[in-house]
Design a protein with these regions (language model features):
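Rossmann-like adenosine-cofactor binding region
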Residues: 164, 173-268
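Rossmann-like dinucleotide-binding domain for NAD(H)/NADP(H)
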Residues: 224, 230-321
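Short loop/helix-cap segments at secondary-structure boundaries that form the rim of catalytic
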Residues: 19-22, 41-44, 57-62, 77-85, ...
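N-terminal glycine-/charge-rich "phosphate-binding" loop or analogous flexible N-terminal tail
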Residues: 1-47
């Protein structure tokens, strides 16, 4: 097989491309850059390394020895060869999106607590109303589902707002990040939900997290609580969430990820009361830092691959992340 690398990341600048090319050349590889999967797919048959995103790209990379996804989430790859075959190394870009998603979490949390949706409506109606009751992150009980890169960075950013406590929940109940006051295993989530004012969801898309926040668990949250989901849409029962919002049994929610994307035009979720919708943009490659850091992460693992060292962001396909 030719020592060939195919890169399909349209956010890369010439500087990023040169950074990749310099490392590749050091080990005898040539690099071809494409702007779209459609353009790249006919040229993948002899590519040893593929860096990009998408199920169709992964399905076409049948000759690859290493497929690196430019995304952090890998649930869309489950039915592809890169996920199923043991002879293909499969890595992701976990760590590239933490900064931009953590800032998104802070933004929408403040938006919900400070009633910005209501005030936007008031201003559009040309009314001068200044006395809506608002709330603060200060003194709030924050629970974060998932203590990976996203959860840890969210905790560190929210820490500056002086919440009463920040509790992280993961499978093991172990995490040494000092941004958390407490770490609990998933088995304790039912105990913690009634004591949660702000619920941040950073869960990966796996069979284990499917409907993790179902109708039963959603109803355990206090009526004044707000929910933010930046992980995967399958982790929340959207219909149950909408019912709670519409009946004022939950104060507000912000969803960046959904059960079906794009959201169907006739889905009632579009007009749900007290719901802030963003179209899966919390972790896009629209922040320069994200593109820079994502490129650095790929180049780090490219060095590892070429020198026979283990990849740092190898996906555990059994776990789904």
């Amino acid at each position: 097989m030719a020592k060939k690398i195919t890169v399909v990341v349209d956010a890369l600048t010439e500087r990023h491309k040169k950074q990749i090319e310099q490392i590749a050349a050091r080990y005898g590889y040539t690099v071809t850059f494409f702007q779209s999967n459609r353009e790249a797919i006919p040229h993948l048959s002899d590519s040893e390394i593929v860096y990009g995103f998408g199920k169709k790209l992964a399905e076409a990379a049948t000759g690859a020895r290493w497929f690196c996804s430019s995304s952090a989430g890998v649930d869309s790859y489950r039915d592809t060869p890169v996920y199923q075959r043991k002879d293909i190394l499969f890595s992701n870009s976990s760590g590239a999106y933490g900064v931009t998603i953590a800032e998104h979490i802070v933004m929408v949390t403040l938006d919900l607590l400070r009633r910005q949706m209501d005030y936007r409506q008031i201003v559009q109606e040309k009314r001068w109303v200044r006395n809506l009751p608002i709330r603060s992150i200060m003194g709030s009980r924050v629970t974060i589902l998932g203590t990976g890169d996203l959860g840890r960075l969210a905790a560190s950013r929210l820490r500056g707002f002086v919440p009463e406590r920040i509790t992280g929940i993961n499978r093991s109940g172990v995490c040494d990040d000092p941004a958390f006051d407490f770490i609990c295993p998933q088995t304790e989530v039912d105990r913690l939900l009634p004591e949660t004012d702000i619920l941040i969801m950073c869960l990966p898309g796996t069979s284990e997290t499917d409907r993790f926040m179902d109708a039963r668990r959603l109803s355990m949250l206090p009526t004044h609580a707000v929910l933010v989901n930046v992980g995967r849409g399958n982790a929340v029962d959207q219909r149950a969430l909408a019912e709670l919002l519409e009946t004022d049994q939950l104060a507000g929610a912000s969803l960046d990820v959904f059960e079906q994307e794009p959201i169907p035009q006739d889905d009632p979720i579009w007009t749900c009361k007290n719901l802030l919708i963003t179209p899966h943009i919390a972790g896009n490659m629209t922040l320069d830092y994200t593109v820079d850091h994502g490129t650095d992460l790929f180049c780090e693992d490219l060095e590892n691959y070429c020198t026979g060292r283990p990849l740092r962001r190898l996906v555990d396909c059994a776990r789904g992340y």
